[in-house]
A protein has these predicted regions:
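Small beta-barrel nucleic-acid-binding modules, primarily SNase/OB-fold domains
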Residues: 16-145
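Sec-dependent N-terminal signal peptides
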Residues: 4-12
Length: 145
């Protein structure tokens, strides 16, 4: 019985993880600016006129601290500024920059995906360096603790 329960739990967790992972199409559109630690703008020449030829991509599966007026406390603002600086630096230093698009964001004005810098995921870089937490739409944990 324990084996059956263990196998069932493993299967459920595998399915849940797979739902978080979205297939991504990779493009080499130029990055135009860094908005914050987990959001970057890039040239989008595929958009028809009169639409602006730029889109934002939010790094899927992470949450970085907010900065400026969106921060809930001075500590979050400082962390948000640091995450933004990290992302800018990583993009500037990279020789090869790719946009990996998974889907449209729930708000419709930007896409979800990842930024691939010299073959490395910005998502993983942000998490490994302490500038982001994994996030898949659940209630966010405060950065003010």
């Amino acid at each position: 019985m324990k084996k059956i329960i263990t196998i069932a739990l493993l299967a459920i967790s595998t399915v849940a993880f797979a739902q978080k992972q979205k297939p991504m199409n990779i493009y080499e559109f130029p990055i135009t600016r860094v908005i914050d630690g987990d959001t970057v703008a890039f040239q989008a020449p595929f958009l028809p006129p009169p639409l602006k030829q730029e889109l934002s991509i939010r790094v899927f599966g992470v949450d970085t601290p907010e900065k400026g007026h969106r921060a809930m406390c001075p500590s979050e603002d400082q962390r948000g500024q640091a995450a933004t600086a990290f992302t800018k630096n990583a993009i500037t230093k990279a020789q090869k920059r790719q946009i990996a698009i998974a889907d449209w964001d729930k708000y419709g004005g930007r896409v979800l995906g990842d930024i691939i810098l010299d073959g490395q995921s910005l998502r993983m870089m942000l998490i490994q360096n302490g500038f982001a937490r994994e996030y898949y739409g659940e209630a966010k944990t405060s950065w003010c603790n």
